[in-house]
Amino acid sequence: MFSVSSVSKSYGKNKVLTDVSLSVSPGECIALLGINGSGKSTLLGILSRNIKPDSGCFGFDCQANAALLPQDNPLIPELTAIDNIRLWHPGSRKTVMNSHNMSICQSLCVDSFLDKRVSKLSGGMKKRLSLAITMMSDPDLLLLDEPLASLDLLCKNGILSYLQNYITHGGSVIIATHETSALDICNKIYTLKNGHIQLAIDRNISPGYTSPETYINLIRS
């Protein structure tokens, strides 16, 4: 299980997160809902241990691996897809594209454009490539910041199908999103407002929170 308890973070006088607590178990997916500036990205940064909170406690297995995929694709446009992979996972092409990593690329349909420059790829291709690179580190907890933003329906469905399979096999996922389609794979929903968790919903306990309109109202409330 991954958890944070009573976490707070400020930048100067700007309070970004205040007394935030949540936990995610193997095989669970949590959605973080909230308008821009509500603290979602900062919370993901803290969970990935890239941002140090001002206060609060962590509850992580010391051997557990958390990986963050930020909203902006961390790719070098002038390089090919395979060379971008090798930046994050050094080695020869043969070493990097072992059976494990090739399986990830095939599952995300990345194997068909490994030799193309990133500058020539569509937004959906870039997102799938970034996700593949992230998954090659074998994360126990996958942190996703707006993974479906600006993608077409086919690409969204492909990514969601991949994530559902990852969750089914015991992976944990936390998604910061505005996309109601992402909520189909989520067990729990947290809404953030002004750095506070405003509402926490367990869909197994509160099945009434199912319609897209409900989630849109939660984000705007």
Please state what every model-predicted region is.
Residues 2, 17-19:
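Conserved structural motif at the start of ABC-family nucleotide-binding domains
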Residues 33-35:
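The feature captures the beta-strand-to-loop junction immediately N-terminal to the Walker
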Residues 48:
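Helix-to-loop junction immediately C-terminal to a conserved catalytic motif
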Residues 86, 98-113:
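Conserved ABC ATPase "signature" region
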Residues 117-124:
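Conserved ABC ATPase signature
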Residues 142-146:
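Catalytic Walker B motif of ABC-type/P-loop ATPase nucleotide-binding domains
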Residues 153-155:
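Helix N-cap at the start of a conserved alpha-helix in ABC-type nucleotide-binding domains
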